[in-house]
Amino acid sequence: IWYVAPKGEKKIVDSGLKFANGLCCSPDQTLLYVADSRSHWLYSYQIQADGSLAHKQKYFHLHVPDTADDSGADGVRTDRDGRVWVATRLGLQVCDQPGRVNCIIPTPNGKVSNLTFGGEHFDTLFCTCGDRVYSRKVKVKGANGWQAPIKPGQPRL
């Protein structure tokens, strides 16, 4: 994982993952989530003021097909309620703040490669799968890194 400073300086902040792929920030922009495509894990890091990362931990255990050795995790996004949405071999896995996969949304034609929230109110989910792009209106709104940080509500257990 590379950190690129506003003036262009670059430094490696973690080289310990098998294959770092999708990444995004939490809605309040205090955590970085990184999908390791060649494992069953999505990691979280606390973002420090200088851009370094601290307190790496395995945050979500991603489910995989019985025939797969890894999750194939790719795109990662968060919604404004703090859930993390991960594109995987099984479909979209939606994870809650305490670190549990709440649901897996299967796709009609295989592995999901990426996803994003769009539309006027960021309440349309778009995902790519094979040679298709799917869209669906959802009851949540996506969080975006270019907007002001959003403090999600307390997680429910």
Annotate each PLM feature.
Residues I1, H40-L42, L92-Q93, V133-S135:
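Structural signal for beta-propeller blades
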